[in-house]
Amino acid sequence: MGLKVAINKKSFEKNGKSFFYLADTCWSAFTNINENDWKYYLQYRKRQGYNVLQINILPQWDASATDLNHSPYQKDEKGNYQFDKLNDSYFNHARSMCEVAKEYGFELALVVLWCNYVPATWANNMLSHNTMPYEEIDGYIKKVNETFTDLDPLYVISGDTDLNEEISCSYYLKASQLLHELAPNCLQSLHVRGRLMEIPEKLIKQMDFYMFQSGHNAKLENRAMPYCLPEYFIEHYPVKPLLNSEPCYEQMGYSSNMYGRFHQFEIRRAAWQSILTGAFAGITYGAAGIYSWHTYGKEFANEVGEGFDSPNPWHLAIHYPGAWDYSDIKVIFDNYEITELSSAQNLLMNGIDDIRAALTNNKLLLIYVPENTKIKLKLETTAIDKITIIDLETRHREVGTVSSCQGGCMVGMHIFEHDALYVVDLK
């Protein structure tokens, strides 16, 4: 059995038990990873607690160069895909990799049509030579269904797409409708472009859960995306499970060829801000060097896509510390038996949007504090049983202090050097 939407319509369950979607991003798996490296990767992420893999079914347009030669279609004399000539060997290979992943206990979130294959998207406008003809969608979707559906994947209909043009939307709508008919028990979503909020109603209706992308743009005006996006989805769309499927990746160069990279703190901040704003169905980790599967001595096309700087090889990227920070989110959810969150921003009196607060299903108040400060709450001290403060980098724990102040109470500063999660037990 695959994942199902829980009865609260806001999270997932599997076999009747709550399921926190903790994914790693491995878009280029089917084209770039050999068998031995695949098994090493799977066992390592499994040890870290990950339970979902996000993979692109077709070749990732900004994957790193590879010596492997896996092509989903036969090619013409110019090297372009002949979309009426599927390569069975490619899909057999992808199927085999998925079977191994399932043996390690992973769920599969498979992207059906990355935006470069769909006309009039931002990526297709940059690189249009492998645009899938509309009439070939049927044959491709049939092949996708035959190859993967009995593995109970999540089908992510789009990849990194904008939805500005009717022709683009028509591709995704057709693919979604076909898969709903062929694979009615497989949940569907869309993976949209960074910072995209507005999704056509006809596509919203097709989705079983929502993915948004706070993305990799480091401009100051975009720093609030991890909580602005879930706020928008919650306000404007019907209730469905919601998650940040592409926060900033660890060690990813800033987009638009801007100098700098995202580090452990930035990716942790994006995750906790999204989750405590209402995107608590799960979170996706990403590491530069893993999603493109970069190896020593191979090229990375900086000019393709959003203009990211070159990554480290996957051998280094797999050991980035932020992957443990994301796995610790699931540990916290499990340890505190958290299955649902509701925003508690109204309890904060600091007036700082970067600080996020949420109430759990079991009388806990969670507060994420990216920079150390006193926290003013619209609560009486008598409403609080105890406060545990977790240093999100070292996992050290501190017993918090609280005192009365005008209009409520004041939680004292912590003694750590990093961002922290306050777990407030309410009476």
Segment roles from a protein language model:
Residues M1-Q48, K363, I375-G400, H414-K427:
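Non-catalytic accessory regions flanking glycosidase/transglycosidase catalytic cores in CAZymes
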Residues Y155, G159, S245, I390:
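Active-site flanking residues adjacent to catalytic metal/cofactor-binding acidic residues
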Residues Q48-G49, Y104, D150-L151, Q206, ...:
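Structured helix-beta-strand junction loops
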